[in-house]
């Protein structure tokens, strides 16, 4: 399976986040921008299963997950499948493993505009619109 960056009008976005309320907020933001959402999931094993079962276009990944897990095994799989990703962390870029120094990072707390900016940068060919089909204003 590979990232399907050109397939279909609604991109599919994987969410990795262990904070329940934040996961729901991210999911709501992405759906409001016209995305289909996979997850959210809070553990590495669950995320790896989701990646294999559901083709994704992009992933938003909390670095530190439940049970002191880090998301790096998931990142390695996404890279192998050529699926772009964004790290979400409260620790800034300093909290990212040096192997992923070139990755896109947004710091918590983040804004809707930051999420939208990541979507536009990583998937510029997708139509960023609301659930009602009306293009979003920037």
Could you tell me what each predicted segment is?
Residues 52-54, 77-83, 94:
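Conserved phosphotransfer cores of two-component systems
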Residues 99-106:
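As written
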Residues 61-79:
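Conserved phosphotransfer microenvironments
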Residues 17:
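Conserved acidic carboxylate
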Residues 40-58, 63:
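Acidic, metal-coordinating helix/loop segments flanking the phosphotransfer/catalytic sites
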Residues 20-39:
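Two-component/phosphorelay signaling modules centered on CheY-like receiver
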Residues 88-89:
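Hydrophobic/aromatic residues positioned on beta-strands within the core alpha/beta folds
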Residues 1-14, 45, 104, 111-138:
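Non-catalytic signal-transmission and effector/linker regions of two-component phosphorelay proteins
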């Amino acid at each position: 399976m590979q990232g399907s960056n050109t397939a279909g009008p609604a991109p599919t976005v994987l969410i990795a986040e262990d904070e329940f309320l934040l996961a729901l907020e991210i999911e709501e933001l992405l759906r409001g921008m016209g995305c289909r959402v996979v997850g959210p999931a809070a553990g590495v094993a669950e995320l790896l299963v989701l990646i294999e079962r559901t083709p994704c276009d992009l992933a938003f990944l909390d670095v530190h997950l439940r049970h002191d897990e880090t998301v790096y095994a998931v990142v390695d799989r996404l890279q192998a499948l050529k699926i772009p990703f964004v790290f979400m962390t409260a620790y800034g870029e300093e909290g990212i493993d040096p192997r992923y120094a070139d990755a896109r990072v947004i710091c918590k707390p983040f804004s809707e505009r930051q999420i939208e900016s990541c979507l536009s940068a990583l998937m510029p060919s997708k139509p960023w619109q609301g659930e009602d089909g009306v293009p979003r204003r920037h």
